[in-house]
């Protein structure tokens, strides 16, 4: 599912970040729930990622996204309701109680804002959404937030201090960013009521003073100041807060210090391999982002991968690499701290480009227009990833997910 924020909004560090008290708890699991069904549109995912990271969307990618949307809309008018099951993608979100309201949020390790649809918006923009019911007495006077993308889309609003409950833990005075205005791109995405950012608080967009993420607010009250992500292939995943669940991974967890200099959970891989081929020595610096659907790697890496896929090509009319849906895709691995982290080939087949098409869109694409590699859900769905702040310095743990062959 999509997510929305590293923005072109000013993200400079302020002198301090406000923390809030919590009710003490221990450790718990948050299960995602299926919340809506939508058609996959590869070029639209690329466009969304570019906007999220403040980059311009090239005309050919936007045209491909728009064209695929039109083709799919036309298909909806036909009499045959049957479409390939892999053309659909469930939205897996997490229920969160904000104040007295239960909303379904996208947990996003690529942003640091907790923002929600609210009753401050025009009613027309709330259609299909659950939303936060504000209490004027809890408003942080003079505080605002704004998400701004290069194409003019975005969202903005006021800031409240309220209870936010995730699983068993309640932050009793969490900064909640209540939307007053959202662009059509957001309001039309009825699957998601907002997001809960899990990146570093240093890129929170609240002004005049940045606020802590929900995790930073509660981490001192957890059994351990960490969370682990288990996204699933064609299934709901989980987020574990305060503990590591050994039943969810195989082998050992490989730890590396995270590069948080830009506010993200960053790391550097020392190489990659395709299928059973030899490891190619190549430094790949990227971030882990649960709010990004696809996986973006250096252009040379993507080219090397698709060179091993019969019939694959970089198609400008589709905005990325495509291949025959019948093709067998090789596994893809990156090397982190000397250990291979492997994505099964079938995970890299994102979807047919349109209903009934025999051409499929790749789940791995070049990072050329983004400027950094992003390891999104295509990568994460085969992994158990630990985000650890135990020593005050962020580190990442990588392990193969239980039940996923490497």
UniProtKB/Swiss-Prot annotation:
Top-level lineage group: Eukaryota
Documented EC number(s): 3.4.23.-
Bridged cysteine pairs (disulfide): 325-360
Keywords in alphabetical order: Aspartyl protease, Disulfide bond, Glycoprotein, Hydrolase, Protease, Secreted, Signal, Zymogen
Organism annotation: Phaeosphaeria nodorum (strain SN15 / ATCC MYA-4574 / FGSC 10173)
Coarse class of the protein's main subcellular location: secreted
Protein name (record): Aspartic protease SNP2
GO biological process, one term: proteolysis
Gene (name only): SNP2
Functional summary from the UniProt entry: Secreted aspartic endopeptidase that allows assimilation of proteinaceous substrates. The scissile peptide bond is attacked by a nucleophilic water molecule activated by two aspartic residues in the active site. Shows a broad primary substrate specificity. Favors hydrophobic residues at the P1 and P1' positions.
Active-site feature positions: 108, 289
Subunit structure: Monomer.
Residues bearing attached sugar chains per UniProt: 331
Residue ranges annotated as propeptide in the record: 20-65
């Amino acid at each position: 599912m999509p997510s929305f924020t590293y923005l072109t909004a000013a993200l400079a560090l302020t002198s301090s970040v406000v923390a809030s008290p919590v009710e003490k708890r221990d450790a718990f699991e948050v299960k995602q729930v299926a919340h809506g069904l939508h058609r996959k549109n590869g070029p639209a995912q690329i466009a969304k990622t570019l906007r999220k990271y403040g980059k311009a969307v090239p005309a050919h990618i936007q045209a491909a996204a728009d064209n695929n949307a039109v083709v799919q809309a036309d298909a909806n008018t036909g009499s045959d309701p049957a479409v390939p099951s892999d053309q659909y993608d469930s939205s897996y979100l997490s229920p969160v109680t904000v104040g007295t309201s239960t909303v379904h949020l996208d947990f996003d390790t690529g942003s640091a804002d907790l923002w929600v649809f609210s009753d401050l918006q025009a009613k027309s923009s709330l259609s299909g959404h659950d939303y936060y019911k504000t209490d004027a007495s809890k408003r942080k006077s003079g505080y605002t937030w704004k998400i701004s993308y290069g194409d003019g889309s975005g969202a903005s609003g006021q800031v409240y201090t309220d209870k936010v409950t995730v699983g068993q833990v309640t932050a009793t005075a969490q900064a909640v960013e209540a939307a007053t205005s959202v662009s059509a791109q957001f309001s039309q995405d009825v699957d998601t009521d907002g997001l809960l950012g899990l990146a570093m608080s240093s890129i929170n967009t609240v002004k005049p003073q940045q606020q802590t993420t929900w995790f930073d607010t509660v981490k001192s009250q957890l059994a351990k100041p960490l969370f682990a992500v288990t996204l699933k292939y064609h299934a709901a995943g989980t987020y574990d807060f305060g503990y590591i669940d050994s039943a969810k991974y195989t082998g050992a967890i490989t730890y590396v210090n995270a590069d948080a200099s830009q506010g993200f959970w960053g790391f550097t891989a020392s190489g990659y391999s395709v299928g059973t081929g030899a490891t190619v020595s190549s430094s790949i610096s990227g971030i882990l982002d649960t709010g990004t659907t696809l996986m973006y790697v250096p252009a040379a890496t993507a080219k090397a991968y698709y060179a091993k896929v019969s019939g694959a090509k970089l198609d400008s009319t589709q905005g990325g690499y495509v291949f025959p849906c019948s093709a067998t895709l090789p596994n893809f691995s990156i090397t982190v701290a000397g250990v291979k982290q492997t994505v099964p080939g079938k995970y890299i087949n994102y979807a047919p480009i349109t209903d009934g098409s025999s051409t499929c869109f790749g789940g791995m694409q070049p990072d050329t227009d983004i400027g950094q590699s992003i390891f999104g859900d295509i990568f994460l769905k085969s992994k158990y990833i630990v985000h650890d702040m135990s020593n005050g310095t962020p580190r990442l743990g990588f392990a193969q997910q239980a039940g996923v062959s490497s």
